Amino acid sequence: SGAWKLPKLADYPAITPPYVTPEMKDNYTPYKRNPETGVRYWAIPGQEGYMHILGGLEKDSNTGAISTDPENHNLMCHLRAEKVAKIPVPDVEVQGCADDADLLIVGFGGTYGHLYSAMEEMKKAGKKVALAHFTYLNPLPKNTETVLKKYKKVVVAEQNLGQFAGYLRMKIDNFTPYQFNEVKG
């Protein structure tokens, strides 16, 4: 294992919420969204004309009032999915014998250290092995399918019952990885 390094916050872009502007006041609705990002505009609480009610029930796509309309629910589900899909995610990187590996090891989360060590040991034994360790799962990096289908043999190694392998199978047509699931540690 290795030390986890704290990121430098100065390296991250500034967070600038899409606040409601004075020009929007006449046609403001709580669920109006930025067309590029799908993110709703933020109204500062307490300002006249910008009332917004939060809660766990489905809301009307425009007014923000509670809605039980099936068409509205369908629209809201799609709007939320589109918003998530627009999140910019860096490509997954391949380490090791990236260009000519016979085996690609795939993992995510806290598996990096031992998967990297396993790859290095296999390389020392003369095997052509690569490692793709995922940091972003939803949305997946845009190059995921290209990376996973490049290799003849792919094994997804997990410290659970194989949920990530199942997720990848669901997201990528005709992807049939081998699985190595270790629950006991």
Segments (PLM) and residue ranges:
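Flexible, low-complexity linker and terminal segments
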Residues: 1-185
